[in-house]
């Protein structure tokens, strides 16, 4: 029995030696293996970049859908409760504030306020500062024929096309703030000539307006009975568009 045991022991040592040799040879990099690794890395980067692009497009479409949903028409509410409750509900859902005639400001987090009982009380002021309101969402505010104060400052989706619809509020609107809206240009401000009842207009800090000082002069001529708030036009005429300091003062901000 000693011979078979010795033979098995010798065979085991030879097998392990071959295994170690094979393992040591596998550690040597060949040109073919390097090229394969490069192809694998390039494929990974290509697939990963495609995934990132797809993810960005998905998130963009999701954001667009969210804004569209937030600006949907409140037709059923309007049919049941009328334009005042519809406009108020829309703004409160957006995170803004509303003021009915003879009442205090109502904000989203206020408790103890039921706007359903104010169905026949006109809305006289709306603060939609920073809200996601767009062209479609304005349809919920335009029926507010007694609206006197409207703040749309820092609204990221408000553009020139939106301003072209504000003529429907010309009969009552007296104060309007467009300060800090990034998509409003001179073309949109030209649409405000319909608002002859305006007494105060804030057009400060509009980055899409290339010549703020000159634009303010033209708006003042267009609305002679309105106080137009904006940059110091004398300074803006001397400075280039890239050298103008931002105007952070806004009397309507609170």
From Swiss-Prot:
GO BP terms in the entry: mitochondrial respiratory chain complex I assembly; SCF-dependent proteasomal ubiquitin-dependent protein catabolic process
Phosphoserine found at: 250
GO CC field: mitochondrion; SCF ubiquitin ligase complex
Record keywords: Mitochondrion, Phosphoprotein
Major place of residence: mitochondrion
Coiled coil: none
UniProt subcellular location: Mitochondrion
InterPro entries: LRR_dom_sf (IPR032675)
Function, as annotated: Required for the assembly of the mitochondrial NADH:ubiquinone oxidoreductase complex (complex I). Involved in the assembly of the distal region of complex I.
Quaternary context: Interacts with incompletely assembled mitochondrial NADH:ubiquinone oxidoreductase complex (complex I).
The protein, known as: Distal membrane-arm assembly complex protein 2
